[in-house]
Amino acid sequence: MGRNGAGKTTLLNGLHLVLYGKRASHVGRTRADYETYLRESIHRGAHQSDGASVEVHFDATYDGELGSFRVRRYWTVGPDDQVNDGLAVFHDGAKSTFITDHWDEVIEEIFPLEISSLFLFDGEKIEALADPYQAAHVTRTAIESLLGLSILDRLSLD
């Protein structure tokens, strides 16, 4: 725990951003929402053209083997006000073009977006779990995500 404004939620949002990019739940649904989020995530004291980046290092089992990953998501705003973003993934110390190009599939194998909310959540979710009126819904959603039931529900609707 920490004081309000200490950056706990910002840290979690950054972790979601580096791992899931525009699929992260807090960045919005459209490309325009994502670009707005990236623009607003550049430090106020920096020039937009300097851009920003988020990087995370972790160990995970991928393709049956334990390995180390370094994932870096970066972005700048060009003179035409266009947001340019990129991703670089290093696996066991070497840049991997294949893993970078297929990152959405790779991260789904390692740490699926559907279950990330069970492990990466902020104080608001803790408050919801403590609220007897919301706890049942939050718990049900978490269990459905863990079991993949929300995916099955969506598939049955399609």
Predicted regions mapped to residue ranges:
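The conserved Walker
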Residues: 4
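Conserved glycine(s) of the Walker
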Residues: 7
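Glycine-rich phosphate-binding loops of NTPases
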Residues: 28-40, 45, 65-118, 128-141
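Extended, Lys/Glu-rich alpha-helical coiled-coil stalks
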Residues: 123-158
